[in-house]
Amino acid sequence: EWVQSYGIGSNDFGQAILESRNGGYMIQFLVEGYGNGNTSVGLLRIDLSGNLIWSKAFGGTINTKSRMFSTINSNEYISVCSQINYSTNSSNAWLIKINDNGEIIWEKTFGKYGEDAGFSVIPTLDSGFIITGKSNSLENNNENLFDLWILKTDPNGYSKFD
């Protein structure tokens, strides 16, 4: 048994963990105070003994928050996050496909003019992805009210609805 701590920013908060199909664990976390001071999405991989294999931060130029991620296959993962612009009070869902080495395969953003956020993502049987979250950019004209938001993508992260 073991206990470890990891960090790349001033404050790091673990948010999700998956067992890697190649052994060890993948951890997604929120990073505060890294780079230009914005919040970023952190991802790290450790072995079964808790030794760090690699650690990366994504985002950096805009505030981001990690939400959830899922295993796609033995060496790929899908993560849903939010990109937040506090000056315009808006946000977009941010979908990132990552390989086992923490390299981004592709990334897509979804949303319009208001607050759109993805909270959960799973792979679908047709090799695409489905995201659920919240939106006040759709039919709703009240910026203080949100609708349940569901978005389906193809295997490359494209959606005909956004």
Language-model segments: what does each one mean?
Residues 1-162:
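A sequence-level/structural motif corresponding to short, flexible coil/turn segments enriched
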